[in-house]
Structure formats: C-alpha cells, structure tokens
Curated annotation (Swiss-Prot):
This is Cysteine proteinase inhibitor 5. The record marks 50 as: Reactive site. It comes from Oryza sativa subsp. japonica (Rice). CDD domains: CY (cd00042). The keyword Signal applies. Specific inhibitor of cysteine proteinases. Probably involved in the regulation of endogenous processes and in defense against pests and pathogens. InterPro entries: Cystatin_dom (IPR000010), Cystatin_sf (IPR046350).
Amino acid sequence: MASKLYYAVAPLVLVLLLLAPLSSARLAAAAAADDDGQWPAGGGRGRKVGGRTDVEDVEGNREVQELGLFCVVEHNRRGGSATRGRGLVFSRVVAAQTQVVSGIKYYLRIAAQEADDELVFDAVVVVKAWVPSREMVSFVPAAELPGY
C-alpha cells in the first residue's frame, strides 16, 4: 500500500521541486524591476509591503483633517512655535500619505497660520486603532516644494 502511495506522490513532488526555482526567479526579477520606490500603475498591484500610499481627496478626508488639527494642537501644547507668543492656528492638511506599520503612520503636510503668515509643516502621526491611541512623532517646517 505504501509503495502505491509513493508512486502516486513522487511525480508531484518532483514537479514541485523543478518549478520552485522558476517561481523564485520570477519573484526576484519582479522585485528588482520595481525597486525605484514609486507606485506602479494598475491599481496598486505589485506594491511593496510597508510602502507609502497617497491619500486621495485630502481636503475632504475628515480623519486626515482631524489628525492635522491634532498635530497643531499637540505642537502648541509642547511649546513649539511660540515665536510671537500665540502659537499656530490650524488651517488644513494639504497633502497626506499613509504607511502600514504597527498601526497606520500618517505623513501630513499641514498649512497653519501664525499671526498673518501661512506656514507649512510636515508632521508624522502614528494611529493605533485597537488601543485607541495616536502619537505625533514629528512636526517640522516643510521643505519648499514647487507648487505650494
């Protein structure tokens, strides 16, 4: 009985062993071809695990706007931007990306008012929905980018 099972299973195992290197080579070639850090076209197929994703309709996204407000309030609470004594006033989030980590990491570009000046900041916030918690990791003046 065991020899019949051997003769039935052995060819399948042999085929799998022969095909395994081919699939590994295809995966390695695909990973190398998409190693420029950019999102591929086609709806996200082939995305890198843990890569950043642009948030669509940032100004209409309530969660993103609330996180931007949280960052400005937290920045003021920590004593940042006291150059004129009043702190920052949140205007809006103008761009955002997400990254899945242990939770979701949001990369936000925030417009805020200080006196009569509109300033732009880059902030990073980690949200862990199961705790629930959110932590502002950084809040710094944005590097100048064309178009803003």
